[in-house]
């Protein structure tokens, strides 16, 4: 499956910012194994899976993104994306949840907007 943006194993603190991703065959943005990563100010919509997915990303930040009309969840943090922050995102009209947190602890979610998920 093809993700719009796949970032995996890059240096800690890597940033994915100000992109427009749509109609990907899988996730719009997938970030794997990048601690302290930042996903900020992106538009991710109409993807076949999730808008934004983080896996094994400790102390990451997902902020000020617009995610909509994705086939699964708008934003998802799973598999030990511990102590991460999700703030100021707009999640609307995703097929399942606007925000899903699974297998992660110490997540802070503030100032997000959810509608019609």
Where are the regions a protein language model picked out?
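Ampipathic, surface-exposed secondary-structure segments
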Residues: 57, 61-92, 104
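Short amphipathic alpha-helical surface micro-motifs
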Residues: 11-12, 21, 34-35, 43, ...
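Short glycine/acidic-rich loop motifs that flank beta-strands on beta-rich extracellular proteins
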Residues: 1-9, 25-33, 48-56, 71-78, ...
């Amino acid at each position: 499956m093809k993700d719009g943006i796949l970032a995996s194993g890059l240096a800690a603190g890597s940033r994915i910012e100000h992109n427009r991703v749509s109609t990907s065959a899988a996730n719009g943005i997938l970030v794997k194994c990048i601690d302290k990563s930042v996903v900020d100010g992106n538009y991710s919509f109409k993807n076949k899976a999730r808008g934004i997915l983080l896996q094994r990303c400790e102390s990451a930040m997902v902020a000020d993104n617009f995610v909509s009309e994705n086939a699964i969840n708008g934003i998802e943090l799973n598999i030990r994306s511990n102590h991460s922050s999700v703030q100021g995102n707009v999640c609307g009209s995703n097929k399942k949840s606007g925000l899903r947190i699974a297998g992660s602890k110490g997540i802070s979610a503030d100032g997000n907007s959810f509608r019609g998920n």
